[in-house]
Amino acid sequence: MKSKSSLLKSGLLLSLLTLVSRVLGLAREVVKSTLMGTSATADAFTVAFMIPNLFRRLFAENAISVAFIPVFTQHYSMPSSAQVPCSSKTKEFLSAIFTLMSSVTASISLIGILGAPYIVRLFDTDQSLTVSLTRLMFPYLWMISLAAFFQGMLHSIKVFVPSGCTPIFFNVSVIFSMYFLNVSHMNVAIAAAIGVLIGGCAQALFQLIFVYMHGFRFTLQSPLKAMHDEGVRRIIALLLPTTVGIATYLLNDLVCTALATSVEIGVAASVQYSLRIQELLLGIFIVSLSSVVLPDLSFHVMRKDWQSFEDLLITAIKIVMLITIPATFFVLFSSDRIITLVYKNAIFNELSVRMTATIFRWHSVGMLAIALNRVLISAFYAQHNSFAPMIAGTISFVTNIILATLLFIPLGGKGIAFSLSAASMVQTVFLWMFLKRSWQITIPSLYKTSLYYGVKITLFSVIALVPTWASSFFTAYFFPGSHKIISHGVPLCVEALIFSCTGCILLLLSRDEFAYKALRSIRFCR
């Protein structure tokens, strides 16, 4: 059983790799904005990459997080090393999953390639270019689904480093492809699509090495035989309810992207640029935390150790609040500086900055809800309950579609961004409500602890903004340079430092448990 400090240690290790990956992901978007801006080409690539990426979330992330890890952890023996490989029962199970996942994703990729002209008609983009890009990138679905399968095996035995490295390979592949293939006068969107394929292949092959090193074995078998595997039937039973929820999620993204492309040129790309920075902020800790916490929650469920389950869940929720609430306030204060510093260039002009910064502010409002949803959904999945997240996700989808349809004409891109944030909050509310039905957890204590901590961090964030706001007048006076590094980068760093230091002092004065653990760790390192 992992202690709180062990959870933090595992989370920080994966967070370090995720930080590198997210920074490179942001660098990828910066290169994209430099070469494409908010042009029709950028919109075409955004749409074309979104289509296989949505199916990836269904067949890769959904299957692994909802069903594979809980079933694998609780019902199958793990290999001890390459010399002592997994049991025959485990090998049969892994072979069945490998066969079905390969067959399904390869078939969908083929259908997507053939049906691309009909799919892209939903979007108001350059049809010819979007079709070519969609066809080129659909095989990425097959590659990344296998990578997710390998990741699930490694996470089940608490091996997180390889899967933390693979997104780095992906981002580097896309960046290098855009730069070097563009030099040879290839269309930059086509170059980026080739990078996507290279990156997906690298993600799968790199993890496969570690899978075999840790003793996992599997082969292709008859799909009919695979369907009759006991573990596969368990996974299908868990996946069926979420298929509806994920289908609504896919439709949700499709509708919002279609609305964005119909507003004006560049809105779809601006939404993507905004989401990339949001993913950087969330991904550094939150994605890593949810990846680390799921196997441990599943372990506590298997042992019926509900007190440890509740303690771990409360710890995860507090960490989420500690990170996302201050980040939200700082983003609302500094969104213009952030977008200017990251994206502004000759092609990504002042109009693009204003459009993206406004969308970014509305996206940031939903960061806490999105982060909480990741942790709360893991709590349901660990209990083999995929029905409650499905219902909450469906309600969120309906909310998003209604709001986006009503707001995209009068408000444009910011209306679409607000709709996503509001829908995420609605999903959080319903997940809390459904969690109340879990009799094993002391819900009043969980609510009270979470609410108190959230209010405390919100208050501290507001207080920390006061000296940050005051310092902005001095930074504007002392750093008026025309170069964005001087006029925006230096002030942003100064303001972030003041905001962070003020917040840390307030946490230490309030004897916050996480602040004291961090302080003890620093003293120990010295």
UniProtKB/Swiss-Prot annotation:
GO CC, alphabetical: plasma membrane
Membrane topology: Multi-pass membrane protein
Localization per record: Cell inner membrane
Superkingdom, taxonomy of origin: Bacteria
Keywords: Cell inner membrane, Cell membrane, Cell shape, Cell wall biogenesis/degradation, Membrane, Peptidoglycan synthesis, Transmembrane, Transmembrane helix, Transport
CDD domains: MATE_MurJ_like
One biological process term in Gene Ontology: regulation of cell shape
Pathway as given in its UniProt record: Cell wall biogenesis; peptidoglycan biosynthesis
HAMAP family associated with the record: MurJ_MviN (MF_02078)
Role: Involved in peptidoglycan biosynthesis. Transports lipid-linked peptidoglycan precursors from the inner to the outer leaflet of the cytoplasmic membrane.
Family: Belongs to the MurJ/MviN family.
Name the UniProt record assigns to this protein: Probable lipid II flippase MurJ
Higher taxonomy: Bacteria, Pseudomonadati, Spirochaetota, Spirochaetia, Spirochaetales
